[in-house]
Regions:
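P-loop NTPase catalytic core of nucleic-acid-dependent motor ATPases
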Residues: 2-114, 120, 179-181, 209
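Conserved catalytic/switch belt of AAA+ P-loop NTPases
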Residues: 128-150
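Conserved ATPase-coupling elements of RecA-like P-loop NTPase cores
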Residues: 123-128, 170-171
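A short helix-turn-beta junction within AAA+ P-loop NTPase domains corresponding to the substrate/partner-engaging
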Residues: 169-189
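Short glycine-/polar-rich loops that comprise or flank the Walker A/P-loop
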Residues: 110-113, 137, 154-157, 173-179
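DNA transaction DNA-binding modules
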Residues: 70, 216-246
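Conserved Walker B
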Residues: 119-121, 138, 164-165
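AAA+/SF3 P-loop NTPase mechanochemical coupling elements
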Residues: 105-110, 143-161
Length: 246
């Protein structure tokens, strides 16, 4: 890690956590709770979920789809997953609310690598378009209160959680920027101290990510092909958007 790169200040923050050493890695103990959480969130797409996390870790400049975790039920682990990422990525991530996207000020998230928007529903066309633009834009005009505007490269990846399973946002049929997953309830699998446990497991998990093959990031602008991340939940949202009932 270096704070200065090519005479420019590095806006990416140093990680609090480091991969464990070869001697410290124990595949029998490993990262049980992190693995359990990832499998719960991504379900039958868990391999894609691991690739997604590896890219977040290895290639912070790479654009990725907007990950949307939906469920109208309680105790699903959506917030726990966001909190886990926040622990892992530290100051490179921010958790905001939908109003922060809708208003004109973006200083809280413009320089972040991961932008999580919790319990979200975006009713206005303006907010929906802003989301889509953020997913692919390469530069952002930073607008903070009482500070002169300035431009910086933008590498933000969006994660949305919502309890609205069908109308969290308007999504047109041709849209390929969303990866929508319905998250089931934990059904007795809960661990009230899971955040403490996953924090301890992060060095083992980072070691594991480093052992995985490099992900091919050249096959699509957002790495994953549309059919790879297509889900029934995404199609339902598109159908609702097309019906005019949004």
């Amino acid at each position: 890690y270096s704070t200065i790169i090519n005479n420019n200040y590095n806006l990416y923050s140093q990680f609090e956590h480091k991969p464990c050493s070869d001697d410290e890695y124990d595949e029998n103990i490993g990262f049980y709770w992190i693995k359990t959480l990832i499998e719960h969130i991504f379900g039958d797409q868990v391999e894609l979920g691991i690739k997604y996390l590896k890219i977040l870790y290895d290639n912070p400049k790479q654009a990725l789809p907007i990950l949307v975790l939906i469920s109208e039920e309680r105790s699903t682990g959506k917030t726990t997953f966001v909190d886990f990422l926040n622990i892992m990525f530290g100051a490179n991530m921010v958790i905001i609310n939908p109003q922060d996207i809708s208003n004109g000020f973006n200083g809280s998230y413009a320089d972040k690598n991961i932008i999580a928007i919790e319990e979200s529903r975006f009713d206005s066309i303006q907010a929906t378009e802003k989301l889509k633009n953020l997913a692919t834009q390469k530069e952002i005009l930073v607008n903070s209160k009482h500070i002169r505007q300035y431009s910086i490269p933008f590498y933000g990846k969006l994660i949305i959680t919502s309890n609205d399973e069908t109308k969290f946002s308007k999504v047109d049929s041709p849209e390929i920027r969303y990866w929508v997953r319905k998250v089931p309830t934990l059904k007795g699998k809960g661990n009230h101290q899971i955040l403490s446990d996953v924090r301890k497991e992060i060095p083992q998990f980072l070691y594991y990510l480093n052992t995985l093959p490099e992900v091919d990031i050249t096959k699509s602008r957002m790495v994953f092909e549309a059919d790879e991340i297509a889900t029934a939940e995404l199609q339902t949202v598109k159908n609702e958007s097309r019906s005019g009932l949004h």
